[in-house]
Amino acid sequence: MIQADRLLGPKLIGSFTAIVAVFTAYQLALNFHAYRFAWACWDYMLISANCSFIAAMVLVLSLTRRFDASLRQLRLNNALVMSDDDVAVLKDRTRQRAHTIELLSGLLIGTLVLGSFIFVFGEFIATIWTTLRMNQLPSGGWALAEFGLFVVISVLSAGIAGLFFGRLTRYGMLASVLSDDHERLRVIPGHFDGACGLKPIGDFYLFQAILLAIPILWLGAWWAWIIPQYKGLVCPVTQQPQMLFAEWRGPFFVQWLVVLGYFFMGFVRPFFKLRQRIRATRLSLVRDEAPRLEQEILAGHGREAVLGPAHAARSEDDRERLSRRLWSINTMGDWPMDSATLAKYRSLLLGEVLLPLGAHLLPRIGNLL
């Protein structure tokens, strides 16, 4: 447990992100020195991958703070009835359950990326290994050292990303714990946040979805569009095609599917788990409370004629209160997010999955037509 928390500490993550940034700057300088403005020769795969990792790390450093803030706002919304000690116990219990998931996730993603390098550079690695077994040094020592550094940074970056994927899964598991606790998690019809009081946790899971959009869209763009579209791209300086693009397509597709699994665990599953709780509460209120409210409102109209002015005014106030409660029940939404936010990000959430698939399938559909 402590080990995983230390690995994901802001100092260590910030230091490693700085190393990746320096390496990326070096690659940019190297590409510019070698190719200048011959853009077709640049190593976009490496540069864009590192830039995506840096962007994700900048965002992910606020993950724990956002999670704590979402729980605090739930309590301020009166949607989560917990003391400070209860919240601490909940966090500790969730951390203990998900500790192994985080470590295994880091190992899985790191191994997956390492396996991808072995798959793509298998013959090259075998040649180097054969040369070393013959007690000889392979040629191109500096280039090999640079390649080795690139592989190490890539695998470590993948492992760190995997640890965070596990943490997203851990926070996603919290939705199941909370949604099953009907006494502590309250669904409040007509709440001012527009999401039955659950907007803070819904917004947090949306943030997790945005984080996962970075690797999903990057991997999807490369396997579904960039590699098929530009696999024959020739560098005008060397007169050689861009190397190894086609070989990366299979590994990128597998990685894309794996990250989609984390998207499901870190956003889709908890989001729908909370939606299930909201819908169950609404059905219960519509079945049990709404008919009683209707009867009381209509009965109040009959009593008003025989009441004095003071009692009539009080009866009017009571009917107004009952009407607001009935309206809030009948107009309850389904999602732990207000409608404006949901509409704003719906295209992004669908695009994470549909854009790569569309880019992959459209050329095939065009050929059939």
Feature names for model-found ranges:
Residues 2-20, 85-119, 146-149, 188-220, ...:
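Loop-to-transmembrane boundary segments
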Residues 73-91, 172-200, 279-307:
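Juxtamembrane inter-helical linkers in multi-pass membrane proteins
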Residues 1-185, 206:
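Transmembrane-helix bundle segments that line or gate the permeation/cavity pathway
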Residues 120-274:
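Generic multipass alpha-helical transmembrane bundles of integral membrane proteins
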Residues 359-369:
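Juxtamembrane boundary at the C-terminal end of a transmembrane helix
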Residues 219-350, 364:
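Membrane-proximal, solvent-exposed terminal domains/tails of membrane-associated proteins
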Residues 68, 283, 352-356:
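Conserved structured core elements
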